[in-house]
Structures are given as structure tokens and as C-alpha cells.
């Protein structure tokens, strides 16, 4: 897996599917949950996407605001496997 590819595909998923705005210029360090852009239920969708798109299973106890609030954090978690 290439980090840049993971970032691009995850960003597209978040913007298009969760934010309903494919053109949104999401910053890598922009807080999504604490910033009120997505809710905790969206984390489950991100977990399913990570498994489907990258073959990476993220356990429920890792799908937390502390671990997955920004695009950077999400990419780091996916890259960790």
C-alpha cells in the first residue's frame, strides 16, 4: 500500500460519501469528528471502507475520536495494518 494512494482514496470517500461534497478541500489535519463534520457512526463506515478498499481490519476499539479524528490519523491507522 502506498501512503499517498491511501490518503487520496480515503479523502475521496470521506468527502464524497460522508460529507456529501466531493469538491470539499479537506485538510490532512482537519478535525472531522470534534469539528462536527461527521459523527461517530461515520467511523464504522470508515472501518468498512478500510477493510474493503485496503484489506485492513480496524477493530471497533480503534475506531475512536482519539485515533481517527483527522485524515492523517486515519491514514496512519490504515498504514499500521
Where are each of the predicted segments found?
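Catalytic nucleophile serine of serine hydrolases
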Residues: 40
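Conserved catalytic core of two-component sensor histidine kinases
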Residues: 44
